[in-house]
């Protein structure tokens, strides 16, 4: 079952940053402000790469999602999660009372309630507006899991340390005549293995 999704309140660039500048500078043992602009740019790049790697929007946004012919569906699975709040539900053009549905936020499930019991949805058109995702570390009351934030810090630190290096060069040793080792392919935007490991539980798996 497919749906159409519209973002009604998008996260700003700053509210998409999955780690703080302070955390990155602490990781790199940098006290000066000389590199702040460059590091912030790397944070933006890492945040985008992590969202792409996880195949989901991580920052908190409010969206409107519409389904057609959901009769027999139990529960409705929202495209984004975790869900922090349901703004409203409209069933065949009629706003539903708040006591006729409930959400399982961590799973992104939306249940229809009849006399406080869970039942299958019966609707030709169902529209749900909800807020989903996490509040990032720079926001008040941040909710982003530490693993995601740590993955961003690791990626930024690795990219910063690797600046100026040949991305195709694995190692280079000088002992007598010297030696070099080259990798077959390289992607300067690739996330480090440690970051990928930290993110494994947050990746959306293909059906």
Annotate each language-model stretch with its function:
Residues 1-207:
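Divalent metal-cofactor coordination and adjacent catalytic microenvironments
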């Amino acid at each position: 079952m497919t749906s159409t999704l519209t973002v009604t309140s998008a996260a700003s660039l700053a509210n998409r940053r999955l780690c703080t500048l302070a955390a990155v500078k602490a990781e790199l043992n940098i006290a000066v402000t000389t590199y702040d602009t460059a590091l912030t740019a790397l944070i933006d790049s890492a945040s985008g790469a992590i969202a792409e790697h996880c195949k989901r929007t991580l920052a908190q946004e409010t969206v409107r999602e519409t389904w057609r012919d959901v009769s027999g569906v139990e529960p409705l699975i929202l495209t984004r999660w975790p869900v922090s709040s349901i703004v409203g539900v409209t069933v065949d053009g009629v706003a539903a009372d708040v006591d006729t549905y409930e959400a399982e936020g961590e799973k992104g499930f939306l249940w229809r309630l009849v006399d406080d019991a869970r039942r299958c949805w019966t609707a030709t058109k169902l529209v749900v507006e909800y807020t989903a995702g996490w509040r990032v570390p720079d926001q008040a009351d941040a909710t982003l899991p530490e693993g995601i934030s740590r993955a961003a810090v690791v990626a930024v630190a690795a990219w910063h340390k690797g600046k100026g290096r040949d991305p195709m060069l694995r190692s280079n040793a000088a002992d007598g005549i010297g030696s070099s080792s080259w990798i077959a392919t390289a992607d300067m935007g690739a996330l480090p293995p440690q970051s990928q490991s930290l993110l494994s539980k947050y990746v959306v798996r293909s059906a």
